[in-house]
Amino acid sequence: MNWREIAVTVSSVGEEAVADLFYQLGCPGVSVEDPELLQSYVESGNWDYHDFGEIALTGTSVVKGYICEDHELQPKLRQLDEGLKELLQRFPEWVLQVKGLTVQEEDWATSWKAYFKPVRIGRHFLIKPSWEEVTPLPEDIILELDPGMAFGTGTHATTSLCLETLEETVKPDMRIFDLGTGSGILAIAAAKLGAQVEAIDLDSVAVKVAQENVELNQVADRISVRQGDLGTVLQGQADLVVANIIADVILMLIPDLKRIMKEDGEFLASGIIGHRSSDVEAGLGEHGLEVLEKKEDSGWVLLRARWQRASL
């Protein structure tokens, strides 16, 4: 099967909006290549410039989406074009360049490997690609991943914020719901901290990849991975609900927290671009939640919230 890879070069503040356009098209794979992250790897001596070409020098980000080259390709391309034009009208400095090329599915599934290297997050997490060898420290918690076509290697600020907060928050035998699990990295991290996790995703590719990563990390006894939305898949209530998605989707999820989160539970919301944080905070407040903690990294925000006592 052939896929059309659309690469949109965009200022970092526009990452979320462009990624959302791809999600609206039903793209099964969306990636963000962050030049600041790649530059940090160069400066630390982990990589050399030739590992990834020009992107580290651009000072922008590249958002890539993949659209199947079938009878729906042209309508989807027109829809994407209209969406990008609308963004350009509202924020002329955001979208800088758009490129497209045809890729084979097997190429799409493996081309990103050049960008994925072992990385330490928080106090103890060591994220290791399945094809890389590392020498761990005794206290390391190894998260071994093969993300394939699913989003989530742990290197993006949104995911690293979640991992750091999980390390501070998770207690043994907690029940956790991971909404939009992607590669399964957050579910696996929580399971290795002792939690029982129910991970869901609407994308069948993500569910397949997440299940493979769960088995790779030998935590299948602590994680269930299912396809579907929280209204049809999740039963009961969790001690902790995690959503590393985008602001608009988080806002749609908030009304359901009353059903799926315990009275003394907490909600971790990440994937929020900085200028949308106030919208999410307002949405939480409108539904009886208070923000306990706000973390920021590279223009992205994580919010940790719980029920206000008066709302129970």
UniProtKB/Swiss-Prot annotation:
* Cysteines paired by S-S bonds: none
Q: Specify the taxonomic lineage.
A: Bacteria, Bacillati, Bacillota, Clostridia, Eubacteriales
Give the function comment from the record.
Methylates ribosomal protein L11.
Can you say what this protein is called? Ribosomal protein L11 methyltransferase
Report the locations given in the UniProt record: Cytoplasm
EC main class here is: transferase
Which gene name does the record give? Answer: prmA
Tell me, in one coarse class, where this protein mainly resides.
cytoplasm
Question: What Enzyme Commission number does this protein have?
Answer: 2.1.1.-
Listed under GO biological process in this entry are: methylation
Which UniProt keywords are given for this protein, alphabetically ordered?
A: Cytoplasm, Methyltransferase, S-adenosyl-L-methionine, Transferase
Methyltransferase as UniProt keyword: yes
Which terms in the Gene Ontology molecular function aspect does this entry carry?
A: protein-lysine N-methyltransferase activity
Q: Which InterPro entries match?
A: Ribosomal_L11_MeTrfase_PrmA, Ribosomal_PrmA_MeTrfase, SAM-dependent_MTases_sf
Q: Which domain of life is it from?
A: Bacteria
